[in-house]
Amino acid sequence: DPAVDIFDREARFIEQVMEPIRQHFPELKIVFEHITTKEAAQYVQAGNRFLGATITPQHLMFNRNHMLVGGIRPHLFCLPILKRNVHQEALRQAVASGSDRFFLGTDSAPHLKHRKESSCGCAGCFNAPNAIPAYAAVFEQLGALEHFEAFCSLNGPRFYGLPLNEDFIELQRVPTTQPEEIALGNESVIPFLAGETLNWSLKD
């Protein structure tokens, strides 16, 4: 609904769409994809085993002040849009709780640099190269590393009723600076956290 403010749409969606669906189909499994608000986090926590949600690394690490204060940072512009810090904190507490109904969802979007840095830029963060180390940094900050593997690898497939992946990756606590940009032919893509240092990296 274009009449609903972009920062209010998630809460309105819960009220007008999600709750009526769940009332009509109480045992329908629903994944609330890429939640961004305190209302959504609380709604999932108050729900039953048929309701889950994914959360992106950018919504755990940033809020709208990071995107807008002191100049627009187009590479943090994504949809659903970043919200107030109170919503960011609610998401962080949700993943730190260890609830098995929250799980990884990167929503990675590798838009070309010139399509992000324009008068009408594309929405999305290209976090595929470093999403796992970024999530690890969040869980470490929250003192919740014991829930990190489940959030990334176990909660999702168990919710969907799928077998767990038998392959594995290993992280090491080695600070790694993220590239400023990634060449793509004659173009380039700016990765999530470009130029910043993460304390975790994937082990070769």
From Swiss-Prot:
- Gene name, per UniProt, is pyrC
Sites where the protein binds Zn(2+) 2: 34
Subunit structure, as described in the record? Homodimer.
Q: Which reaction does it catalyse?
A: (S)-dihydroorotate + H2O = N-carbamoyl-L-aspartate + H(+)
Q: What GO molecular functions are on record for this protein?
A: dihydroorotase activity; metal ion binding
Active site (UniProt)? 107
For binding Zn(2+) 1, which residues are annotated in this chain's numbering? 107
Keyword Phosphoprotein included in the entry's annotation: no
UniProt cofactor(s): Zn(2+)
- Keywords linked to the UniProt accession: Hydrolase, Metal-binding, Pyrimidine biosynthesis, Zinc
So what family is this one in? Belongs to the metallo-dependent hydrolases superfamily. DHOase family. Class II DHOase subfamily.
Q: Which domain of life is it from?
A: Bacteria
Broad EC category = hydrolase
Q: Name one Pfam family in it.
A: Amidohydro_1
Give the function comment from the record: Catalyzes the reversible cyclization of carbamoyl aspartate to dihydroorotate.
Residues that hold substrate according to the record: 79, 111, 123
E.C. number(s) listed in UniProt: 3.5.2.3
Any idea what this protein is called? Dihydroorotase
